[in-house]
Amino acid sequence: MKRDLYEVLGVAKDADADEIKKAYRKLARQYHPDVNKEADAEEKFKEVKDAYDILSEPQKRAQYDRFGHQDPNQGFGGGGFDGSGMGGFGDIFDMFFGGNGRRANPNAPRKGSDLQFGLSIDFIDAIFGKETDVEIPKEAECDTCLGSGAKPGSGVDTCKTCSGTGQQEVVANTPFGRIVNRRVCSTCEGKGKVVKEKCSTCRGSGRVKVRRKIHLNIPAGVDDGAQLRVTGEGEPGANGGPPGDLYVVLRVKSHEFFEREGNDIYCEVPLTYAQAALGDEIEVPTVDGRVKLKIPAGTQTETFFRLRGKGVPHLRGNGRGDQHVKVRVITPTKLSDKQKELLRELAELSGEKPGQHGGEDEGFFEKMKRAFRGE
C-alpha cells in the first residue's frame, strides 16, 4: 500500500509550497544514491521525488487531496462492468443517451509525450553554470516508413473492428442500467488504421529507438531538483502532431567541504586554541578561491563569520548570496611536557589551580579545555 505523500515528505497537509520544497531538498540530499550507500536509498529517493512531483504542482496536489492515490478516472469495478476505459464527458453521454457523445478523432494530430532525463552535475557547476552535451535515449519517427508503420509501397486499411474510430463499444448491464462503455480498440490500438505489411525497420510501430545529442546551457545558481525544459525534444507526435518536450532534472552532487542552503554557502574551518585566544588572519576556501578572514582575539568555538557576496548567484536577477564560516576550536590531544608546563603557568597567573572543579574555584585549565570542546 502506497504511503501518504505528505507523510513521505514529513510535512503537514496544509504545508505551503516553500515548506514542501524545503522538506524535499533535505530528504533528496539525505537519500541521494551518490551520497547514501544504503541498499534502500535509491528506492526512498524515488519515493521522495514522486511525492514532490505531485505536491509541488497545484493541480496535481488538488487532485491527490481529493482522490488520494486512486485514479480519478477509474470507474466501478465488478458486476460485469469494467470502467478502465471510461474518460471524459463523451462516456457520460453514452451512459444516458445511448452512445451519442462526441468521440475523439484517432487520426487527428496529437502532440508527443514529454520525456524526463536525470543529469548529475558537480556542486561547483551548479554554482557557476555550465554548457554541456548529453545523449538522450528516446524514440524518433522511423525514416523508412515516415512514421506510418507500413512497408514502403504497401497500403494502410481502415480498421474493420472499430470502423476507423479507434474505439470499441462494450455494453454492460449494471445496477444502474444498461451502460455503453468505450475502450481503445484492441485491433488497431486506437489508431483507426491497420497496416497491410509492417515496416521491417520499426516492425510496424512507426518509431525507432535512438540516442540524440542535446546541447544544454545550465544557468548559474541552479539547485538540486531544478528542471530544464528543452522544447521539441520529447517523443515524436502522432499523425503529424508536434513532438513533446524534454525535461532535464538536475541532481547536484554533494561537496566534501561546502554545503548549500538557498543562495548561501556554509563551511567549517578549524582553529588552534592559540589562534582563538590571541586572534589571527587565516585563509578560507570559497567557490571563488581562497580569501583572508580576520579572527579576533577571544573567538569562541562555533562562532560564525560572514563573507558577503561569496555565495550562490541569484538564479533570477543580480547579486549573490553569502558564505557563512563556522570556526571550531580544536583541543590538542597530545601535549609535550613544555606545553603542559606553560599551560600550568598560565593557570597560576590567572589565580587558579589546574585540576579543581566546581563553582567559582573551577580551574582555568579545565574551563579552557571544555570551552575548546564546545561544552
Swiss-Prot record:
Residues reported in the UniProt entry to bind Zn(2+) 1: C142, C145, C199, C202
Sequence ranges of the CXXCXGXG motif repeats: 142-149, 159-166, 185-192, 199-206
One GO term (biological process): chaperone cofactor-dependent protein refolding
J domain: residues covered: 4-68
Cellular component GO terms, alphabetical: cytoplasm
Family named by the database record: Belongs to the DnaJ family.
Quaternary organization: Homodimer.
Protein name: Chaperone protein DnaJ
